[in-house]
């Protein structure tokens, strides 16, 4: 959270406030951004699946209108969440990232996973409830580790076939049941590039709402092994000198922060700050 944005469970029965609208194509925007007067937005011809009270931005209540489909609204368009992450007001991006996670979770938990009956929102906590099963479902968060492996002035970067052409990044992967973040790190590095690491240090974390990851950032030192790329997962992996790096991930991502932080420390430059 930030001084401007705090999440909260708000009753949609209350009036007023701001609202954001999310469709399969992203968030509704106009020349002023993605926040709209709630009363005005609810008067538009929108196919609303559900409404969620999600928190306060600059002291004002904020609600999410989760839509079944995209609609035409005069003077407005639709914009994907990633573009908000890359540029603009980062506090607003956090509002939209939270909204996206809540909208995705509630959409995917409309029916009980045990008995198949419809679930209802609990008004006093962020949960969906099945009365026949007495079962609560809470928002999903998927812990993932992301690590910069270093060897003196060299850093180990890789690229996936899914990356933007030419871009290299740090190694990352989801934690498995029963694993610590450190266990996950060692396993993922070994699986993806067949390298062993040591001196694992936690650096920081970042919410990654695509759709519901929590990125746990680490630095680790190379301990041994030759790079062997995991088929279908790693397109290329190699050591790069900190003074001769390839195209890198977006500046607001934790992947870029891990790289920039290490380069700054090796070069005696001011350390960057991780956007939170």
Swiss-Prot record:
Signal peptide per UniProt: none
Names of required cofactors: Mg(2+); Mn(2+); Zn(2+)
One GO process term, biological-process aspect: NAD catabolic process
Residue positions of motif Nudix box: 173-194
Residues annotated to bind a divalent metal cation 3: 188, 192, 233
Entry binding sites for a divalent metal cation 1: 172, 192, 233
Binding site for substrate: 82, 125, 138, 206-213, 255
Its EC number(s): 3.6.1.-, 3.6.1.22
Reactions performed catalytically: a 5'-end NAD(+)-phospho-ribonucleoside in mRNA + H2O = a 5'-end phospho-adenosine-phospho-ribonucleoside in mRNA + beta-nicotinamide D-ribonucleotide + 2 H(+); NAD(+) + H2O = beta-nicotinamide D-ribonucleotide + AMP + 2 H(+); NADH + H2O = reduced beta-nicotinamide D-ribonucleotide + AMP + 2 H(+)
Bound cofactor: record note: Divalent metal cations. Mg(2+) or Mn(2+). Binds 1 zinc ion per subunit.
The organism's place on the tree of life at top rank: Bacteria
Domain Nudix hydrolase, first and last residues per copy: 139-262
Keywords from the UniProt entry: Hydrolase, Magnesium, Manganese, Metal-binding, NAD, Zinc
Chain residues that bind a divalent metal cation 2: 188
Binding-site residues for Zn(2+), renumbered to this chain: 112, 115, 130, 133
SUPFAM superfamilies registered for this protein in UniProt: Nudix
GO molecular function, one term: magnesium ion binding
Cellular compartments per GO CC: cytosol
Subunit structure: Homodimer.
Function (record text): mRNA decapping enzyme that specifically removes the nicotinamide adenine dinucleotide (NAD) cap from a subset of mRNAs by hydrolyzing the diphosphate linkage to produce nicotinamide mononucleotide (NMN) and 5' monophosphate mRNA. The NAD-cap is present at the 5'-end of some mRNAs and stabilizes RNA against 5'-processing. Has preference for mRNAs with a 5'-end purine. Catalyzes the hydrolysis of a broad range of dinucleotide pyrophosphates.
Family statement: Belongs to the Nudix hydrolase family. NudC subfamily.
PANTHER family: NAD-CAPPED RNA HYDROLASE NUDT12, NUDIX HYDROLASE, NUDC SUBFAMILY
Protein name as catalogued: NAD-capped RNA hydrolase NudC
Organism: Pseudomonas putida (strain W619)
Gene from which the chain derives: nudC
């Amino acid at each position: 959270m930030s001084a401007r944005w705090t999440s909260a469970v708000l009753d949609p029965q209350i009036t007023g406030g701001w609202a954001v609208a999310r469709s399969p194509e992203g968030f509704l925007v106009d020349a002023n951004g993605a926040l709209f007067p709630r009363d005005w937005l609810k008067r538009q011809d929108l196919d609303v699946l559900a409404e969620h009270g999600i928190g306060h931005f600059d002291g004002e209540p904020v609600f999410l209108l989760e839509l079944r489909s995209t609609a035409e609204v005069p003077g407005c368009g639709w914009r994907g969440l990633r573009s908000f992450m890359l540029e603009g007001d980062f506090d607003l991006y956090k509002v939209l990232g939270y909204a996206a996670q809540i909208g995705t979770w509630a959409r995917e938990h409309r029916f009980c996973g045990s008995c198949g009956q419809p679930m209802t929102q609990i008004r006093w906590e962020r949960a969906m409830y099945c009365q026949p099963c007495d079962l609560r479902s809470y928002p999903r968060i998927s812990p993932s580790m992301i690590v910069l492996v270093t060897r003196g002035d060299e850093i180990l970067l890789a690229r996936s076939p899914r990356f933007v052409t030419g871009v290299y990044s740090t190694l990352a992967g989801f934690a498995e049941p029963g694993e610590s973040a450190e266990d996950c790190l060692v396993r993922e590095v070994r699986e993806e590039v067949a390298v062993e690491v040591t001196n694992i240090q936690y650096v920081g974390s970042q919410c990654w709402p695509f759709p519901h990851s929590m990125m746990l950032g680490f630095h680790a030192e190379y301990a041994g092994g030759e790079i062997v790329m995991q088929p279908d997962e790693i397109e290329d992996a190699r050591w790069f000198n900190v003074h001769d790096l390839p195209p890198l991930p977006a500046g607001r991502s934790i992947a870029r922060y891990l790289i920039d932080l290490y380069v700054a420390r090796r070069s005696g430059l001011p350390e960057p700050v991780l956007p939170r």
